[in-house]
Amino acid sequence: MVLGGDAAGVERPQAAAYHGPTYGEREKTMADVVAFKKEEPNGLLLREANGPVLRLTLNNPPANALSIALMQALAAELDAVAVVKEIKVVAIAATGKVFSAGHDLKEMTLHRADEDGGKAFFEGAIRLAADIMLKIAKLPQAVIAEIDGLATAAGCQLVASCDLAICTDSSTFCTPGVNIGLFCSTPMVALSRAAHRKQAMEMLLTGETIDASTAKDFGLVNRIVPQQYLRQVVDKYAAVIASKSPQALKIGKEAFYRQAEMPLADAYDYAVGVMVENMLAGDAQEGIDAFLGKRLPEWKED
């Protein structure tokens, strides 16, 4: 990736031209897609489509707790965007000073009075969060977490589940469940796959908060930027990604997560098959021809 900087010394990708069709060149726009009407999904989740980038913003003040309503809205948006080929990148951001405090403990506590002590509700809420993380991994588009503030528990899980994570220098992260007698078992799944193993265990066993620099050292985030540049840097990453072949991105993202769970020999065997099929795909042929012909490729819709 080609990187650049500015007067603030922020290292980030150079903006790349999006060579696919523009919205004005399409008969079918976002407004034509039922799942992406002008109305917001609900007040808890804000949606903004800008060319090939969809930004979903958590909006549940004061701490953007992942209530059932917010998670249902987020799950629905991820399901909807999965089939919208015009969108190449999804950014997940948040309003306020907290990215997300995780599950809505007040909402969950209310259900302790249920006949089963809240078991059914707890399972539904925790499983819904897990399903969202799986949707992110399976989404054909790249997903970037845009963090400014605290990401804790299931909020940290959300960050760890995204393909990339970019945060401000004042952001902090933790999995504090152990502090209240509730080990962060489901956040552990994402965290152990994003961060280095020993560091993930450190976060899970101590419940202590780490700063942005430590999160980057742990492998939880990709980049740290000053707050005023956060959106700009995320947008530039999104532009770089959106300029690539959607076919290659879809194939590559799926292959990345699948091979990561395989033994080494099996992973190579699988990856050989994936790469052979990718070589036969139209975009690979176009990309190679464009490279040899010293011109920009013209990607086809996947």
Which residues make up each language-model segment?
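Crotonase-fold acyl-CoA enzyme core
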Residues: 134-247, 281, 286-289
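Helix-loop "lid/cap" segments that line or gate small-molecule binding pockets
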Residues: 203-204, 255-258, 274-279
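Terminal peptide-recognition signature
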Residues: 56, 74, 92, 104, ...
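Catalytic-core regions built around general acid/base machinery
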Residues: 77, 128-139
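Glycine- (often His-adjacent) and acidic-residue-rich active-site loop
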Residues: 94-132, 263
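Amphipathic alpha-helical segments at domain termini/boundaries
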Residues: 30-58, 209-241, 250-259, 286-287, ...
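Conserved CoA-thioester-binding segment of acyl-CoA-metabolizing enzymes
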Residues: 23-95, 134
